[in-house]
Amino acid sequence: MRIVAIIIVLIGVFFAWQIRQAPTEKFIPVAEVVKIESGSPKAILVMNAGEPIELKEGESRQVADVFGVKVIQDSTGGLRFEDREGAEEEIGKSSVIVPEKGEYFVILSDGTKVWINSDSELEFPNRFGEDIREVKLKGEAYFEVTSDSRKPFYVLAGETKVHVLGTAFNVSAYREDRQTEVALLRGKVSFDVKDKVYVLVPGEIATLNRESGETIVRKGDVAAIVDWKAGRFNFEDMSLEELTVKLSRWYGVTFVFSDEAVKKLRFSGAMTKYRTLDYVLDMISKTTDVTFSLKENRVTVSSKK
């Protein structure tokens, strides 16, 4: 009987220990989780307020033929608008909507090339009119504008306007960000903010703080800013808060910080953006005093200390 009693007591202690040890929520180190793949070329095309057309990498087809403008999708994840008539009247509008975990390349009817980043939207005429070329941007895009002195090119982004003749530049104007930024790689643009005009030369970056209304023009590494369109992350002395916003758009995850101080830590590094999320976070954690853990689609960033 004494042995039976001891066994019963031990069983009770074991189950009590199990109950105390049961976790309420389990966060798994990123290196141990199922890999989260990077983004890829994909978008939605809406023409003349019609039905949305899904665009995916690997498909090659004619999407539409509207009043002499042929719309072609190629297999590499791009779309081009071919103006076969060369007419001067503007015909309808199209929008290319790129979701999180996406990117897309578009050639407009005048030959202008546009790389559209994730979580962004570009609206433009199917064919430009005779006086101006005007597009609207939400989010981020890199432009290589076909030169035409007769038709200035404008990018409308929120309350700002970029005026171009023929040049290569990047515009970042995400609605949820606190700033709008224009970075000029080559050529010349003017950045119009309300009643002020800022003229940029290559290598300059104009940043509008949308909260204070202040605009700052500075020299910077524009090549690093536009590296995203060449398939690379290039983080130059970037805060973890800003860095994780970029990662969240590309990988479709949410980042949360265990400590406000962690947001201010800075990171520099460059890598391909087509690696899995765990690879990218592992590279960051090796050179920064932070760890990453994931539950479902939420990544928690914590200090190692």
Language-model segments: which ranges?
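Sec-dependent signal peptide hydrophobic core
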Residues: A5-I8
